[in-house]
Amino acid sequence: MTDAPIGIFDSGVGGLTVARAIRDQLPNESILYVGDTTHSPYGPKPIADVRRYSLEVLDLLVEQGVKLLVIACNTASSAVLRDARERYAVPVVEVIQPAVRRAVAATRTGRVGVIGTVGTIASRAYEDAFAAAPDLRLFPRACPRFVEFVETGVTSGDEVLRVAAEYLQPLRDADVDTLVLGCTHYPFLEGAISYVMGEGVSLVSSDIETAKDVYRILVSGGFERHDSAPPTVRYEATGLDAEHFLRLAHRFIGPEVSQVDLVQTGVIDLSL
């Protein structure tokens, strides 16, 4: 069990931010990453579909023998976390609570913005997560085109800045001092988001805090990897275009992603 990989899943390349943070903090751990590019993006899809897609990918990871699951997707975290923790015998880590924890520590004024996909914002998952900090005022905002930009490799330029300004102006008007990047794709747009929000606004993402949660669970459970052999890091995608995923991975996290394998998930009937 200790030598088994950590399983990480996202709808596409956004979860690579989380995978990179886990590799930085736990360099001896093996990783198996799956991007569900067949169904990406998750954000605009009905929650029932997101739930089914997510469980199909998580089933695939468990079948491949992972020792811990990371749902590196805010939309999936909001849709399937409870199901996943009931369904699987391995620990399940999500990305919403880690971001909330960091935002609560970062804010000075108690005015916190959160941006995410339509699905994440509509789920009110962040409102629920921030409920334990009643002195904070939360300003949620859906930014649906941000995932589209990242998944097509566009992270800068006039159109990105124009769309970012349109999405973020209400948060500037609300005078937030902390902005939660409530989608793991959004750190790839951090330059544009930071430029639009201006100095004095702290941007909070879940990647580093999620990696801390993974570290804590592995150490406290006594199943961190001690093998002296180099760890393995594998990347899989459910879509038909592994080369596209590979190009984006090279651009965003570097040439260490040398291969992407295509995989197929099973089909789950959640009506049973």
Swiss-Prot record:
Top-level taxon of origin: Bacteria
Keyword Isomerase tagged: yes
Record-annotated active site: C73 (proton donor/acceptor), C183 (proton donor/acceptor)
GO MF, any single term: glutamate racemase activity
Role summary: Provides the (R)-glutamate required for cell wall biosynthesis.
Gene: murI
Reaction(s) this enzyme catalyzes, per UniProt: L-glutamate = D-glutamate
Name the record gives this protein: Glutamate racemase
Keywords: Cell shape, Cell wall biogenesis/degradation, Isomerase, Peptidoglycan synthesis
